[in-house]
Regions:
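Amphipathic, hydrophobic secondary-structure cores in small proteins
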Residues: 46-48
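Catalytic core of pol beta-like nucleotidyltransferases
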Residues: 1-30, 36-43, 52-105
């Protein structure tokens, strides 16, 4: 398991990572929220931040596919936040997570 052994929900994280192809359209992908808590019972959903450089309509298609596929794989609601690289910086989104995120791409 390696880097993921610190997470009690590593089996869910591994399912997401094993389907990394779903995120090909995005430059960066981060997991955050209750999935990363070390409590298997408190997962409310799977929070994923997707970062892109240039917007195009295929982002919307990718969003639907990611949500559907990962919901089936994990059994949890998939909450996606999609930001451009510039929005990510302007909003300081990662700073607001206080390093409680896992970059998977």
């Amino acid at each position: 398991m390696g880097l993921l052994e610190e997470y009690k929900n590593a089996h869910i994280i591994e399912k997401i990572i094993s389907n990394i192809y779903l995120f090909n359209r995005f430059n960066s992908v981060y997991l955050f929220g209750s999935l990363l808590l070390n409590d298997r019972l408190k997962i409310s959903d799977v929070d994923i931040l997707l970062v892109y450089d240039l917007f195009s309509n295929d982002i919307l298609d990718s969003e639907k596919l990611i949500r559907s596929k990962l919901n089936c794989l994990t059994g949890y609601e998939i909450d996606l936040i999609i930001l451009s690289s510039s929005e990510l910086e302007e909003l300081h989104f990662l700073d607001k997570l206080y390093s409680k995120y896992l970059k998977i791409k």
